Regions:
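Active-site-adjacent core segments of small-molecule enzymes
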Residues: 1-231
Length: 231
């Protein structure tokens, strides 16, 4: 009997651990948010496009170099800030899951870059043209995607759903204010980009400095024409 009780206890522990793992993986229940649910929502709205990214699907790749000024070397010992020239690969894109969407249809533009140093250090950062994000959690982002889904009957966004989302997420006000006054430029190259998170730069003394990236274009701003032939 004692051995049977021990085996039963072990089995209960293993069953509980398995159930916890399944719950964390999103295998149990239909309300838990998972990456797959977000992907499915993108595809339900924009369509299924095999071989393309599920968000920021339309874009173009670039290559170049990063030449540090030396000013950041006091904030970080990272080689990216002391190497004379750092090779860079990147990708410009517009927001959304449709790779054939018109360039002018979505205000959000993005730039993702990877810096590879000569000592093997690799930096990656994702940046958008808005200086702020509308929300800060995956759940809130999922709710934002649902709120912006077009109404099947009209093909347009439902103002009531958008208002309800805004009321539930007052932190999105800064993003809405930016979007209301946004004037798009006529090129990715004349757009300013902001990192969507801050990086902890560690200096020679071990002190940490949270620093966001911001890329300011050298190309002069020119407004996007009112009528654009989008290919």
């Amino acid at each position: 009997p004692a051995k049977a009780l021990r085996l039963a206890a072990i089995g209960a522990v293993m069953l509980g651990a398995g159930a916890a793992f399944a719950y964390a993986a999103g295998w149990l229940g239909e309300t838990r948010l998972t990456p797959q649910r977000i992907i499915d929502t993108f595809e339900a709205q924009a369509g299924h496009y095999p071989g393309y990214r599920k968000n920021h699907a339309k874009g173009l790749c670039v290559s170049g170099y990063f030449q540090p000024s030396g000013q950041a070397a006091s904030l970080s010992t990272a080689r990216a800030f002391s190497q004379p020239r750092v090779p860079v690969i990147g990708r410009f894109a517009i927001g959304g899951a449709n790779p054939f969407a018109p360039d002018t249809g979505i205000p959000v533009r993005s730039l993702a870059i990877e810096l590879s140093t000569d000592v093997g250090q690799v930096w990656r950062t994702g940046m958008n043209n808005p200086p702020v994000l509308a929300v800060s959690t995956p759940q809130a982002f999922y709710e934002q995607v649902l709120a912006g889904a077009p109404d099947p009957a009209t093909g347009k966004r439902d103002p009531g759903r958008l208002q309800a989302f805004s009321a539930a997420h007052p932190e999105s006000g800064a993003f809405r204010q930016w979007a209301a006054g946004y004037k798009p430029s006529n090129s990715f190259a004349s757009t300013q980009y902001h990192s969507i998170n801050a990086f902890r730069l560690i200096d020679a003394s071990g002190a940490a400095h949270p620093v966001p990236w911001q890329l300011e274009p050298q190309t002069a701003f020119a407004a996007l024409p009112a009528q654009v032939h989008d290919k």
